[in-house]
Amino acid sequence: MFENYRTFETTYAGRPVKVETGKTCGLANGSCWVRYGETVVMANVTASAKPREGVDFFPLSVDFEEKMYSVGKIPGSFTKREGKASDKAILASRCVDRPIRPLFPKDMRNDVTVVITVLSVEPDNSPEIAGMIAASIAISISDIPWNGPVASINVGYVDGQLVLNPTLEQRAHNDLNLTVAGSADKVVMIEAGANEIPDDLMLEAIKFGHAEIKNMVAFISDIQKQIGKPKFEFESMELDHDMMDKILDQFGDKLKYALDTDDKTVRDARLVPIQDEIVETFSEEYENLPDIIGEVMYKAQKTIVREWLYNGKRVDGRGIDEIRPLAAEVVVLPRVHCSGIFTRGQTQVMTITTLGPVSDAQKLDGIDEETSKRYMHQYNFPSYSVGETKPSRGPGRREIGHGALAERALVPVIPSVEEFPYAIRCVSEVLSSNGSTSQGSICGSTLSLMDAGVPIKAPVAGISCGLITKEDGSWMTMVDIQGLEDFYGDMDFKVGGTKNGITAIQVDIKVDGLTYDIIASAFEKTHKARNYILDEVMLKAIPEVRPTVSKWAPKMLTTKVPVDKIREVIGSGGKVIQKISAECDVKIDINEDGNVFVSGLDLAKAEQAISIINTIGNDPEIGAIYRGKVTRLMNFGAFVEIAPGKEGLVHISKLDKQRVNKVEDVVTVGDEIVVKVMEIDDQGRINLSRRDALADIEAKKNAE
């Protein structure tokens, strides 16, 4: 029945890989299963028979489907179905899309869809890496034109050694999470988060990963030779070369004048009448020109701008390694916890940081081992930031990707929960965009976090590097690309980091790959630019982290109780902890390990709650002073509750410094008084003294 069923086996990073084709999904253009250890993914690729009408781009979509059954979970949603793609799945889709997209024919407009379905997950073997391999195989053996194959790999840095596809245990103490995708001779995608890794070590890690990628690419190429289908002929949508030559000859000077300004608004205004004039001049000769004028204008501008850049001219007059004018500001909003605005040319980003209790950490319901994250970064890109009108539909893949990059850049410098027991949310609002908004988000977030009093280990800045290549193989790179240079260039090499090293990388390319020399040049230029931004702008706006959090932020205190005392702190049905929360106006979170987090706007009340919790969680100490509540009066003394469930007796002789005839003369039920623990007998009964507590407090005041 399955006469086309084939299997192929190899090893990758020392672990077995098995590829199966010809058994399932027979109607897709290309399909395969990849088993990487016990991680199993299925990839299917399909293409439309005809090109899509009215588009000037290649319509590729990539979906990475996380199935909860792959990790033995039932979805937590009301419907118990997988819902919209998680952020992690979207990021995985982007990590497949970016390497494969530049390898499709530039003039093809047929819809192509790649669907990667995660069927089984072994934590040691990444489904994202297996998914990239599966997608590459599915496209390679299909009849869809493509200049692959490619593969990807994860590189870690564990205990001073570079590691390929680190295991779950190794990832727990890993200083580098680098994903590299490559072809047989070039690097086509880089995505990284790192603990301040030096440039030279990062380049070494890329080369280390690429060496193993070459083996997988050779394996996929061999599969393609054995079972690959002939590639179909497609209708080329390439623009008429003669038409483009005529337009550039007649309107080249006007286009150059329109483009030669550092003001995006002025440039756009200048281009509108030129576009209308081109249509009016050539529409009789080329009847379809009104339908393709957008693509014509794109290609004409691209030709001019690329030639300028290669020869060292930038539209805003900057040098190749010159950064746009910069500005940084903090405390821009009065009642938020903290805020910062970072401006680079016509790109402006405002980041607001909000601090909350640790329980506000984001809960993650996915196939990953991670269940929550305490530091969250979200990026918003409204249409007004580029002067357009468009309805707000919530964050798209681009916004999620940019937010994740800024988050990765800051995570290595965020203090541990023990050092700073808060959940932290940064929101970057793009106010104006002319390129490199994600890097502006990194800078704005650093300003905001420092303003918030978050003791980050080092300030982080972000910068991008662009690329122009020629057909003869020559190339040049430029730092701090603006929108036009990103749009018409070949690369957006985004790097975030401190003065000590790199914390995040994201590389998008439009060519068939990067050489090591190009990557080294990008590292060198971004490193210098990062240091300049930090020294000359950001650290002048806020030289060091605020010593305290904002008065509007909750005050957070921590303590730890023995695990066997957690039940007492919580109380039956939560009565004890609810009572403490209500009386002290605080929020209390208790972890399974006994760590307790108390948050509230009033520091004194938070300290009171901590004192009560410590009293419950730890046996009363002889000689310690507590504040308790009088619960009962007897002829011989008063019973005082120093913590929920812990009561002691203040004998009438120890109620006051003077002789007391009646207990009621000194205290009544409900009074709060200070008491000192004098004795705990064999039966656990606590003897207290108000007289000694008052004497100790008075002696301490006199000593001060």
Describe each model-derived feature in a short phrase.
Residues 1-48, 235-369, 554-568, 576, ...:
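Extended amphipathic alpha-helical scaffolds
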Residues 36, 45-47, 64-66, 116-120, ...:
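Flexible glycine-/small-residue-rich
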Residues 28-112, 118-125, 184, 191, ...:
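Glycine-rich, flexible beta-strand/loop modules in the N-terminal catalytic cores of phosphate-handling
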Residues 106-112, 147-149, 216-234, 265-266, ...:
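Flexible, glycine/charged-enriched surface loops at secondary-structure junctions
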Residues 552-558, 563-704:
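Single-stranded RNA-binding regions, centering on S1/OB-family and related RNA-binding modules
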